[in-house]
Amino acid sequence: MLRMKVKKKQAAQRQIDIDTDSFKLKDQEEKLQAGRYIVELVSAVLAGREPDAKPEDLPVKAIYRMAKLHNLDCIVYDGMKRIAGEADADLMEEWANRNTICAAQGIMQQREAKNLVKELPARGIRVLPLKGSILKEFYPQTRYRQMADVDILIDRKNMEKAHTVMKELGYKYEGGDSEDTVDKYYKPPCVSIEMHSHLMHYHAENHKKYLDIWERCKEENGVYHMNWDDYYLFLMEHFAKHFNESGSGIRFVLDIYIFLEAKKKELHPEYLKKKQKELGLEAFCREMEEIAYRWFDGRPEIRDSKYETVILLAGIFGIRQWAYAGQQKKYLEKYKNPRIAKGMYLLGRLFPDSDLLLCELSVPPRLAGIDKHLILLFGRL
């Protein structure tokens, strides 16, 4: 019997579409200079060498602010304390205190994460630890990899059960995201947990390509782990998502370098290349890997490309105004008429959870061609 080969549909390669020119940041040149020097400080710490001298016109305070923005307080502090002068003593004392607090937070986060991956499976909830809690172990010191929160994937059907367990463990429910794929919890003094029901939001281009992630994992006592190829693919997918929405910072690029240095011998390049192409990430991965090694493998070489400018300025959470400008540009390209584009953009801001609501409204296939925001507007009315 003849079998026809069916080619998997490949996602279009993603393009940078961040309009950095439409919104200039306050003190943008100083922030760029601080970002460049942070790369130098991090590179020096990783290599165990003395950092190059700080530019004379760059205040230490600007470096401190940008280190916090990029969530790199601890590793940058270890570089900065080697060259700070007497004039910087007060600020460096403040920074040292923050370094201690961040390190303590990291210890508490890891302790809680280990407890959760024990308690949740014991209640019949399978778990897949994500992102930072795994990466921390690959950094020279775990405190260097700071986390805003601990991310854990569970089954959607177990969200309510997990809610009960979290309350029993002393967590307060902080709400969910607009697409109802994340429940957020907080435990004093400083531990935030995000329980994910999906790796990607419903509206994400590659959402369906991660639905089988559980089947691709290895399990041990109810705790699941991705193979390193899939872990790296998701790391890059997550980076690309943030980058294309509003930019994302130095920490993401550092994660790439740290991970590849730790695990590249266990990766399968041909498989990764094939999957990156299917996900539309091939060019993005190639570019970011190249930047990661130029910046952190030896003395940094920064070329100030658009990619690099975005990374140096964006910080860990990106620039809100860049995201708005990018959304408006996409609406204008779609509708051509500026007034219509502006109206549809405003509707989009009113209905950020539109894809989920479309499912809840059971929109029939025959209406698929009608703009979703118009459907939602009348659906809610």
Model-assigned labels for residue ranges:
Residues 2-148, 154-381:
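Conserved NTP-donor binding/palm subdomain of two-metal-ion nucleotidyltransferases/polymerases, i.e.
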